Amino acid sequence: MSCVNIRGCCIGEGRPKVIIPIVEPTETAILEKAAEFSTLRADCVEWRIDCFKGAKSLPAIVHCAAKLRVVLKDQLLLFTFRTKAEGGKVALAHEEYLHFIRTVLATDCADLIDIEFFTVGAELPALIEEAHTAGAAVVCSSHDFHKTPPRAELVSRMVAMQQAGADLPKLAVMPQSRTDVLELLAATAEMADRHPETPIITMSMGALGAVSRLSGEALGSAMTFANPGQASAPGQVSLEVVNEVLDALHL
């Protein structure tokens, strides 16, 4: 598997890198949480902007982003606006979403930016190129909170993300059975073995899929989301447990 190197952090090499989400509603609370997170054992902080009360105010986002970058120092910062269609808090029209992405890129504060595969559609390659020009790596994401598609579909979706230029294809799906969890894990291993051009991030959500958040080094998922006190998705495991298990399973 190839490696994405950001601020000396090699994503795709060794132990999966740990992401912890900020989901607070106000700038004050966000910055307080960031100061707390800067002392924790985590590689990356995700700002879930759709949880921010100013989510539809671009000036408020820009103002908070600049302060957040300073507080986190050299900790990786991932910007995410999870749309309502993909499990987030706020609905955005297509043009609003594109404008948001471009506004965040212009701040020069993002190490990584989440771009939703289906939300952007045909404009994905051009938007990824814009992100790279701005110096941000792209997490290209797809979420299904209802089911787990067949393995072939999961693999083809991640390959399409790679072909569009994404640095880190990401899939999150909901299992309805143990077999669904195995489908996601098998798709992850297949991608890592047969399409190692980029690292990938995968997870099977909910309690049933929690094993997928902990087995990344062996099966091919380069990053995992942990719960530092407040989860941003179903099935996130506590940061303490994630670190303990990743250490125990380190190859």
Language model features with spans:
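Active-site beta->alpha loop and helix N-cap motifs at the rims of alpha/beta catalytic domains
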Residues: 2-3, 13-133, 143-148
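Glycine-/acidic-rich phosphate or pyrophosphate-binding loops and their flanking alpha/beta elements
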Residues: 6-7
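Catalytic alpha/beta core domains of metabolic enzymes, predominantly
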Residues: 112, 117-251
